[in-house]
């Protein structure tokens, strides 16, 4: 049987879940890299100061600070799959909140949306990092994690091109 970083010795393949989880690494790299682009747009469109626009990063990373432990507890109780689902739901809600925010033109509303996105990203990272390590043989877990993390970097590169 052909060796693979996502196949067990018994022949079970985890290729599909690995691809799905690895795409999440790209997603959160993209989300982080687009923050600076959003920041500049908020300064111009909403006419806010550079100091006030620093709240963009503060609320996203505040979501990490406040959600990290609850996300870990959630994962311990319900598992990685439900952690990924919770993260995607929160991320999606935060992103969808940008639509009414575009009508309200309220910086505070956008900040709340970004906070929800940050909470979702926290759940995704808390679940995806350990989950990708169990999708195959244990001795290949570092290789799987490194490969997945490389897509995070790709998201960081692509984000400003899409948002700019």
What are these regions (language model features)?
Residues 123-137:
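Intracellular juxtamembrane helix-capping segments at the cytosolic ends
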Residues 140-163:
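Glycine-rich segments within core transmembrane alpha-helices of 12-TM secondary carriers
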Residues 16-48, 128-129:
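Extracytoplasmic
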Residues 89-104:
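C-terminal ends and interior cores of transmembrane alpha-helices
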């Amino acid at each position: 049987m052909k060796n693979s970083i996502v196949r067990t010795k018994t022949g079970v393949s985890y290729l599909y879940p690995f691809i799905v989880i690895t795409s999440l690494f790209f997603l959160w790299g993209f989300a982080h890299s687009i923050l600076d682009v959003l920041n500049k747009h908020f300064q111009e469109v909403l006419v806010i100061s550079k100091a006030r626009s620093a709240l963009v990063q503060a609320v996203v990373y505040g979501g990490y600070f406040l959600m990290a432990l609850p996300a870990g507890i959630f994962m311990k109780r319900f598992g990685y799959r439900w952690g990924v689902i919770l993260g995607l739901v929160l991320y999606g809600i935060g992103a969808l909140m940008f639509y009414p925010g575009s009508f309200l033109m309220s910086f505070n509303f956008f900040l709340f949306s970004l906070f929800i996105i940050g909470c979702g990203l926290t759940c995704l990272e808390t679940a995806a990092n350990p989950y990708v390590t169990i999708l195959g043989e244990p001795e290949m877990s570092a290789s799987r994690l490194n490969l997945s993390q490389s897509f995070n970097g790709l998201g960081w590169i692509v984000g400003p091109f899409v948002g700019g």
